[in-house]
From Swiss-Prot:
Function noted in UniProt: Participates in chromosomal partition during cell division. May act via the formation of a condensin-like complex containing Smc and ScpA that pull DNA away from mid-cell into both cell halves.
Subunit structure: Homodimer. Homodimerization may be required to stabilize the binding of ScpA to the Smc head domains. Component of a cohesin-like complex composed of ScpA, ScpB and the Smc homodimer, in which ScpA and ScpB bind to the head domain of Smc. The presence of the three proteins is required for the association of the complex with DNA.
Family: Belongs to the ScpB family.
InterPro entries in UniProt: ScpB_csome_segregation, WH-like_DNA-bd_sf, WH_DNA-bd_sf
Keywords in alphabetical order: Cell cycle, Cell division, Chromosome partition, Cytoplasm
Disulfide bonds: none
Entries under SUPFAM superfamilies matching the protein: Winged helix' DNA-binding domain (SSF46785)
Compartment(s) of residence: Cytoplasm
GO cellular component terms attached to this protein's record: cytoplasm
Organism, scientific name: Streptococcus pyogenes serotype M12 (strain MGAS2096)
Gene Ontology annotations of biological process type: cell division; chromosome separation; DNA replication
Protein name (Swiss-Prot/TrEMBL): Segregation and condensation protein B
Source organism, top-level taxon: Bacteria
Length: 183
């Protein structure tokens, strides 16, 4: 194993936090000066290699492996895809409500959840899991939301009727006993 491959492996595992010069030097039993030379070689290797997406950066004596600037657009698009970014519990709740009650307004969703759902709706719209499906014919004409074809693909189903059936949940006996009034 070369020093370059060892440095690369350590920085890869360290991820976003990176490693300090002192920590790297102690792990590799190198002097700071010798390590600096190895880091410079690694940095030059990445700069010259057009087939590598990586580069080495140093911030306040901490070194990290990051992707080259030219990949920013590609990585931004990747990060926005639902398959590669987990949905929050709130987003999953809203998505479930829309899937089973569509078309439905934000206010109706808020009433079911008991909290504001605007943020979750925005995220689901951005991920193309839901869409605006017209306006409700009431005062204020609020938007109606429904799932998209992409939602069906994401869930691995062909039709909404393939969603699992949700029955009204019966409260457990312990819960019923808890809320009984004692005379």
């Amino acid at each position: 194993m070369t020093y370059l491959s060892q440095i690369e492996a350590l920085l890869f595992v360290a991820g976003e936090e990176g490693l300090s010069l002192r920590h790297l030097a102690s792990m590799l039993s190198l002097t700071p000066t010798a390590l600096q030379q190895q880091l410079e070689k690694l940095s030059q290797k990445y700069e010259k290699d057009q087939h590598s997406s990586l580069c080495l950066i140093e911030t306040a004596n901490t070194y990290r492996l990051v992707t080259k600037e030219g990949f920013a657009g590609l990585l931004r698009a990747y990060a926005k895809t639902p398959m590669n970014q987990s949905l929050s519990r709130a987003s999953l709740e809203v998505l479930s409500i829309v899937a089973y009650k569509q078309p439905i307004t934000r206010i109706e969703i808020d009433d079911i959840r008991g909290v504001n759902s605007s943020g979750a709706l925005s995220k689901l719209l951005a991920f193309d899991l839901i869409r605006e499906a017209g306006k409700k014919d009431v005062v204020g004409r609020p938007h109606l939301y429904a799932t998209t074809d992409y939602f069906l693909d994401y869930m691995g189903i062909n039709h909404l009727d393939e969603l699992i059936e949700v029955s009204a949940v019966e409260p457990a006996d312990e819960e019923i006993a808890l809320f009984r009034t004692q005379d």
